[in-house]
Amino acid sequence: MVLTNPAEIRNPAAPPEITQGLSENVILTTLDDLYNWARLSSLWPLMYGTACCFIEFAALIGSRFDFDRFGLVPRCSPRQADLLITAGTVTMKMAPALVRLYEQMPEPKYVIAMGACTITGGMFSADSTTTVRGVDKLLPVDVYIPGCPPRPEAIIDAIVKLRKKVANDSIQERGKLLQTNRYYSTTHQMKPTAPLLTGEYLRSAARQAGPLPAAAGAAVAPQLPVTEKEGRDRA
């Protein structure tokens, strides 16, 4: 009969000690979680500001709000950014440049529409034919920030919501999570009309210049003689 040391007796119903030791040194996760954690912790924005909304975003750089705690590092090149923040009015002339900046950003990339002028065109879309009535007509927008202009606290809330969206992304299902609808805005309805500036106002008698001596109330000195060669040189 062989006697076993009591210290070597193991309870078969208890969790094994090997697993307990590994659990303290090994992190079990998925590729999506690791990939999303790295991206949401280092969002590098490209700031596209054309109006007063951009000043509110600039307030986040200060110590009061400190947007560096979210891992935001502003970049000057679209090839180094993964977040495009549009703040201000977008015109027809600037639309191709904005789309080009978005196309130069590497995938995956996100867009935040900041302010009423960016979302719907704002007050400029009422009587302007050159204002884009909603940046979502050009780019897929992930987060909207309404306001004129929105407060820095609203921008932080949008960053937090975007981080939650990034955390739920899946590499395999990313194609199914693309934007399917747009923010409700008025479409452009261009109607050709006759030009208002016909030149008749400038040709009116009231706009014609009167005699110079009478207007100035003083005599005008005679003009200096100009030779034929000097006249050709001036022409």
From Swiss-Prot:
Range of residues in the leader sequence: none
Region (Disordered): 216-235
Residue positions binding [4Fe-4S] cluster: 52-53, 117, 148
UniProt keyword Nucleus, yes or no: no
Gene3D superfamilies, sorted: 3.40.50.12280
GO cellular component: plasma membrane-derived thylakoid membrane; respiratory chain complex I
Membrane topology type: Peripheral membrane protein
Biased composition range(s): Low complexity: 216-226
Keyword Phosphoprotein among UniProt keywords: no
Family designation: Belongs to the complex I 20 kDa subunit family.
Protein name: NAD(P)H-quinone oxidoreductase subunit K
Native source organism of the sequence: Synechococcus elongatus (strain ATCC 33912 / PCC 7942 / FACHB-805) (Anacystis nidulans R2)
